[in-house]
Amino acid sequence: MKLKKDKRREAIRQQIDSNPFITDHELSDLFQVSIQTIRLDRTYLNIPELRKRIKLVAEKNYDQISSIEEQEFIGDLIQVNPNVKAQSILDITSDSVFHKTGIARGHVLFAQANSLCVALIKQPTVLTHESSIQFIEKVKLNDTVRAEARVVNQTAKHYYVEVKSYVKHTLVFKGNFKMFYDKRG
């Protein structure tokens, strides 16, 4: 059932407030209107496009991390609960893929996961001690990879972090990281 313009606009605002990472395409499917209509409604509501919403959320999250600088982070940090869990997203661009196949280079997915582990741990010095990783599915040009990291254990010198990365709802990468930390810096 299609909503009247005012009700649709309010519903769009509520959807974006509850999930700032929802795409115009997903909104258009949800409200059964064209993507152009969604864009006009967002403009009327002064709601920025997805990339800008992601950047705004990421900027707030970078204030919570101490072990890595924003410009060193791979992807955009979209959620962080220090020493507990964190999420990032990474858009796969032409610089990130093999040109012949359009498949993402493995070190790009590893770098996203690794920098997420470093950012997750709120200590002055955090280094990767060891990792065990698996590439599950191919990641392609223009995919958006969402990495989720969570601390599974902590000792006097190490955090043990599990990372799972997804494209939409498909698991594409997983890894276990043993992260050394030093409180002295």
Swiss-Prot record:
This is Transcription factor FapR. Keywords: DNA-binding, Fatty acid biosynthesis, Fatty acid metabolism, Lipid biosynthesis, Lipid metabolism, Repressor, Transcription, Transcription regulation. GO terms for molecular function: DNA binding; DNA-binding transcription factor activity. Coiled coil: none annotated. Transcriptional factor involved in regulation of membrane lipid biosynthesis by repressing genes involved in fatty acid and phospholipid metabolism. CDD domains: hot_dog. Belongs to the FapR family. GO terms for biological process: fatty acid biosynthetic process; negative regulation of DNA-templated transcription; negative regulation of fatty acid biosynthetic process. Pfam families: 4HBT. The keyword Signal does not apply. SUPFAM superfamilies: Thioesterase/thiol ester dehydrase-isomerase.
